[in-house]
């Protein structure tokens, strides 16, 4: 079967609802492992096994875990889902996340990711931006390690421009 042709999408019953299994290629820019990690996080909140979660409960749980402070980007995505007012399934949850992040292989998607780093609107990624993202992701990197990353990635040695970031993201290693 060619890459353009896809097998019919299988449906599995989940409680009284139907859940559609999507293939990883349905989410450009996400690997199968990344989709699986997102699914595991979603399932933590699907305590009744219905395949659906209430965004209000998800937001409250994330807030109680400090996500509004530790990872405001993800928290705000969940808060936007809350405005819909109905339970969401995994595909809706994944759509919300991927629409915010975009396709990491397109310039537009890479620009969206850049904007997640550039929270101060300086149109560059500086040491403070890297420290914040490192903390949000739970990484334990020293200021020296982050400064070295900047030095290597930035064409001027101080901060990463949008163009520097794009070049880093599209660089392929073999």
From Swiss-Prot:
Residues 33-68, 88-103, 105-140, 141-174 form the EF-hand domain. It is found in: Cytoplasm, Cytoskeleton. Residues 1-33 are annotated as: Disordered. Coiled coil: none annotated. The keyword Ribosomal protein does not apply. GO terms for molecular function: calcium ion binding. Signal peptide: none annotated. SUPFAM superfamilies: EF-hand (SSF47473). It comes from the Eukaryota. Plays a fundamental role in microtubule organizing center structure and function. Component of the infraciliary lattice (ICL) and the ciliary basal bodies. Belongs to the centrin family. Monomer. PANTHER family: EF-HAND SUPERFAMILY PROTEIN, MYOSIN LIGHT CHAIN 1, 3. This is Caltractin ICL1e.
């Amino acid at each position: 079967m060619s890459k353009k042709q896809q097998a019919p999408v299988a449906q599995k019953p989940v409680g009284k609802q139907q859940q559609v299994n999507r293939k990883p290629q349905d989410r450009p820019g996400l690997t199968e492992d990344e989709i699986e990690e997102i699914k595991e996080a979603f399932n933590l909140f699907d305590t009744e096994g219905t395949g659906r979660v209430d965004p209000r409960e998800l937001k409250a749980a994330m807030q109680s875990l400090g996500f509004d402070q530790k990872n405001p980007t993800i928290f705000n995505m969940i808060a936007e889902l809350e405005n819909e007012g109905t339970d969401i399934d995994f595909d809706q949850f994944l759509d919300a996340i991927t629409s915010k992040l975009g396709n990491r292989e397109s310039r537009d998607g890479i620009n969206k990711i850049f904007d997640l780093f550039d929270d101060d609107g300086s149109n560059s990624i500086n040491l403070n931006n890297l420290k914040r993202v490192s903390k949000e992701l739970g990484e334990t990197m020293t200021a020296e390690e982050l400064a070295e990353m900047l030095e290597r990635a930035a064409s001027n040695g101080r901060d990463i421009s949008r163009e520097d970031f794009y070049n880093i993201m599209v660089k392929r290693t073999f």
